[in-house]
Amino acid sequence: MLENEDLAPLIDQQALAEFRNRALTPEHPVARGMAENPDTFFAHRESCNNYYANVPAVVEEYMEKISEITGRKYGLFDYYGAPDAERVIIAMGSVTEAIREVIDHLTAQGEKVGLVAVHLYRPFSAKHFLAAVPKTAKRIAVLDRTKEPGANGEPLYLDVKDCYYGQPDAPVIVGGRYGLGSNDTTPAQILAVYENLAMAEPKNQFTVGIVDDVTFTSLPQQEEIAMGGEGMFQAKFYGLGADGTVGANKNSVKIIGDNTDKHCQAYFSYDSKKSGGFTCSHLRFGDSEIRSTYLVNTPNFVACHVQAYLKMYDVTRGLQKNGTFLLNTIWEGDELAANLPNNVKRYFAENNIKVYYINATKIAQEIGLGNRTNTILQSAFFRITEVIPVDLAIEQMKKFIVKSYGKKGEDIVNKNYAAVDRGGEYKE
């Protein structure tokens, strides 16, 4: 992380002071642009052209300075992928990290694919953009995270089309939309974009992440693939709003992040009901940088903290072969076998899933924690997965208990200590 002292030499303090002195303030009132005739307004509006024209060079200069400090290359447009890529995606924002994951997967198989990540969108520098795109590119897909009904395309798509206007041997360019309303964008969807570019006539103005059965803009969904490489552990926790599952998982991430060299990531999804509603926690731990900017869809471990979810949601979806499943349930033995849905039992058998179950609800009531099963199930998670040494996990959990509940009295702390200790009462 850069400190202020690292960045201070890059800033022209005098220019910054002059800028602040021009700020509107009631202590030094000034009127600007109150009234202007048409002949001068138009001319004044165009007078800013040179300032905008100079912005790319200025930004590039400072990006080079930042690159020197961080050791990471930053440009107005950054290319990633095969040097002789024929199919290229143009995008900006967090989705570019997911695209990089897919590129690594495809180039390892000999595919000629790439990405141009946009860092300076306005003003859009055609010169820098064209320099970033490989000369070998034959097909380009431009991804926009917006929709402009009635237009011939979305903004970034039209900018890219304009860059190639009138050029001989220009690549085929199509546009698509993704991620509206924070809709998840997964590797399978990125794969669909590259597959679309490989078609004889790629679909233009396509969508990914939805099934559009009205106007048929959506691309066929590809099968999800596990990303992250060796050493990546992914987990999903299905819980009930206010049962403490989300809070416990936030603590788990802190425990692992603070006590190991592992990279950690946590996403949390909720429905609109909050308390009493559906929650799902998505955790990742890895030995290398985590570039997955989407919810976990191929977990190694799944915990279902509400047994009713077995018949309400597809809780085993994406669980990897030889993965682990933990169920909080009141059922045992033959009753458990009788109540598990057939599709769940079939998935367990076909994918060699290790299944554990625990009656955390009963344990919580015996301890005096009511319906707060979170600490019990968090303890079970650490014991089953051994993602970090169990003794270390238990020690750190108890430290977090003191930090979280210490002000509520020794009785509450001791009850949560008991919950940690009884987290080992699961059965296989």
PLM features per residue range, with description:
Residues 50, 181-234, 413-428:
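Flexible inter-domain linker/hinge segments
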Residues 55-121, 214-299:
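Non-catalytic terminal/interface segments that mediate subunit docking, oligomerization
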Residues 29-39, 160-172, 217-225, 310-321, ...:
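Short secondary-structure transition/capping segments
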Residues 40, 44-47, 176, 402-405:
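Active-site-proximal beta-alpha loop/turn segments in soluble metabolic enzymes
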Residues 2-5, 159-163, 251-260:
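A glycine- and small-aliphatic-rich helix-loop capping segment at beta-alpha/alpha-beta transitions
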Residues 123-124, 139, 143-154, 229-241, ...:
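Active-site cofactor/cluster-binding pocket
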Residues 1-78:
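Conformationally flexible catalytic loops at phosphate/diphosphate-handling active centers
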Residues 60-209, 282-284, 299-301, 324-354, ...:
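Thiamine diphosphate
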